[in-house]
Design a protein with these regions (language model features):
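Substrate-binding pocket helix/loop in short-chain dehydrogenase/reductase
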Residues: 84-94
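Active-site helix of classical SDR
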Residues: 96, 107, 142
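C-terminal helical subdomain
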Residues: 166, 174, 178-217
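Conserved glycine-rich cofactor-binding loop
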Residues: 14-15
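Residue(s) in the substrate-gating loop at a strand-loop-helix junction
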Residues: 126
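Active-site loop immediately N-terminal to the catalytic Tyr-X3-Lys motif
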Residues: 133-137, 180
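Conserved NAD(P)H cofactor-binding loop of Rossmann-fold oxidoreductase domains
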Residues: 77-83
């Protein structure tokens, strides 16, 4: 899937990786980039269309679909981390609403547009999808659930010409990791690696040094083999 001359929608596009993805899509020659955010922002490039899009707001999702008449690449980037403990029910519900159900609801809403032609869905997750981060268990749970969703979508949509790419970054230098004193990749290099991975049609994209270090091991793992085995059971089936 080439970025040049494509139409792209990025959720969570107002900062961090999302903002960098908008810039990188433009650099690669995207024809139109819809920048979805809870607080839309103006952009100097006329190819960018700001869209009010809170991924937990059904009315805003419907309105966004009505604005987008064609779409080649949907990038589900919106996500949050609250650093709360497991006993906080409100935090559990909020994290799942954004990181899991937000991804699903946006995907489901745009699927009729995406399925009109060969297209791609890019779900920006985390290495916490594969192994829990003990000091942020709720975030890890939500991302693990979104990873399972993404694997399912990959199998279910393969017969409809819609590819699904799962992005598994390590720590990135964004507001979310501001207080973590650990090595971090830049949003710009991460965005570049993500879109390079989409163009190379990589199923899983490991876009930074920390994640890249485990890429080969993951692709040759028993868990990956099991995923392929389960995916082989799936016939072309509508998403439910």
């Amino acid at each position: 899937m080439k970025i040049a001359d494509s139409t792209v929608l990025v959720t969570g596009a107002n900062r961090g990786i999302g903002k960098a993805l908008v810039k990188e899509a433009l650099r690669k020659g995207a024809k139109r980039v819809y920048a979805g955010a809870r607080q839309p922002f103006a952009h100097a490039d006329c190819r960018v269309t700001p869209v009010a899009l809170d991924v937990t707001n059904a009315a805003q999702i419907r309105a966004a679909v009505e604005r987008v008449d064609a779409l080649d690449i949907l990038i589900n980037n919106a996500g949050i981390s609250l650093m709360n403990d497991l006993s906080d029910r409100a935090a559990r519900e909020r994290l799942l609403a954004v990181n899991l159900f937000g991804t699903y609801d946006v995907t489901q809403a745009f699927l009729p547009v995406l399925a009109r032609s060969r297209s791609a869905i890019v779900n920006v997750l985390s290495l916490a999808s594969l192994a829990a981060v003990p000091f942020d268990p709720l975030y890890s749970i939500s991302k693990a659930a979104a990873f399972s969703l993404s694997q399912s979508l990959h199998a279910l949509l393969a017969g409809r010409g819609v590819s699904v790419h799962i992005v598994l970054p390590g720590p990135i230098d964004t507001d979310m990791t501001r207080n973590l004193d650990i090595p971090k990749a830049s949003p710009e290099s991460t965005a570049r690696a993500i879109l390079d991975g989409v163009e190379k049609e990589e199923e899983e994209i490991f876009p930074d040094p920390m994640s890249e270090a485990i890429a080969e091991g993951w692709r040759g793992s028993a868990l990956k083999a099991l995923q392929r085995q389960f995916a082989a059971y799936v016939e072309q089936t509508p998403v439910k």
